[in-house]
Amino acid sequence: MNKVNILPSDTNMKITLFSELSVGISANSILFFAHLCMFFEENRSKPIDLCIAFLSLTQLMLLVTMGLIAADMFMAQGIWDITTCRSLIYFHRLLRGFNLCAACLLHILWTFTLSPRSSCLTKFKHKSPHHISGAYLFFCVLYMSFSSHLFVLVIATSNLTSDHFMYVTQSCSLLPMSYSRTSTFSLLMVTREVFLISLMALSSGYMVTLLWRHKKQAQHLHSTRLSSKASPQQRATRTILLLMTFFVVFYILGTVIFHSRTKFKDGSIFYCVQIIVSHSYATISPFVFVFSEKRIIKFFRSMCGRIVNT
């Protein structure tokens, strides 16, 4: 593993990576603060606010952890020991899984919230925050149980050079695995992620069906005077579809780039592009929430008004 060739010579790649992380950290901090305050301040707190707060907090920690890992990538020489390597890389892998779990839970909860009263999903509408927290915790524990092998595979290689190790940072690398172990872990990971993404896709498809039915009923009842304004249900459904599209596109791109990287001996550029693409959803999704929810804008306006009046 020649570490001189691992570091990208293009400074623009470094600037792009840290710019994305900075923007994402700022946006998720704002989103987390807004939804946490709205959850505790409003008379009827919505469980979906807690779920979005979970998602933004997970993405915030994911981007911060990635920032620490990226800092070690661009150093001249690695300084981390094996404990730091294993802790940060394992924590980062867990946060990526938690992000998927939180996004999946949000889509499902949104489906319950926007379902009509005649739907069989109505009974799930008014579940307490304890149920939301419990479901999120269950998904997280499930994800943790499949990622413990990283503690064995991650090693500190600040002073070692070998073509058999897979580069992670200047300090850390992954040990090679046998074909059978690689296939087993890959199958478990793909099964887990396909299951969660399928739940997101099913909930999104269900919402599209509901939106289509609602639109047909509205056209039938108000055929002569249709309103050009989108209803809250329509806006929420568009937000769900937009988030789902972003997630799937970035997930597929990240997977393609990862497999392209493994085919090249010096995959430094592919590695950096993979990191940028795989963290794009965590950077972009807060802006989708902020611009699609009028409550957030009203919340910040009222907060600014309080500050001015004090």
UniProtKB/Swiss-Prot annotation:
Any one GO MF term held by the record is: pheromone receptor activity
Question: Would you say which domain of life the source belongs to?
Answer: Eukaryota
Q: Where in the cell is it found?
A: Cell membrane
Cysteine pairs forming cystine bridges in this chain are: C85-C172
Q: Provide Extracellular-side residue ranges.
A: 1-19, 71-93, 156-193, 260-268
Residues that carry a glycan: N159
Q: Name one GO biological process term.
A: sensory perception of chemical stimulus
Any transmembrane segments, and where? 20-40, 50-70, 94-114, 135-155, 194-214, 239-259, 269-289
Tissue specificity, per the record, is:
Expressed in 1-4% of neurons of the vomeronasal organ. Only one pheromone receptor gene may be expressed in a particular neuron. Not expressed in the main olfactory epithelium.
- Cleaved signal peptide residues: none
Q: Which UniProt keywords apply?
A: Cell membrane, Disulfide bond, G-protein coupled receptor, Glycoprotein, Membrane, Pheromone response, Receptor, Transducer, Transmembrane, Transmembrane helix
Naming one, the record's GO cellular component terms include: plasma membrane
**Which membrane topology describes this protein?**
Multi-pass membrane protein
**Membrane topology (Cytoplasmic):** 41-49, 115-134, 215-238, 290-310
State the function annotated in the UniProt record.
Answer: Putative pheromone receptor implicated in the regulation of social as well as reproductive behavior.
Q: Which PANTHER family match?
A: VOMERONASAL TYPE-1 RECEPTOR
Q: Which family does it belong to?
A: Belongs to the G-protein coupled receptor 1 family.
Name assigned to this protein: Vomeronasal type-1 receptor 101
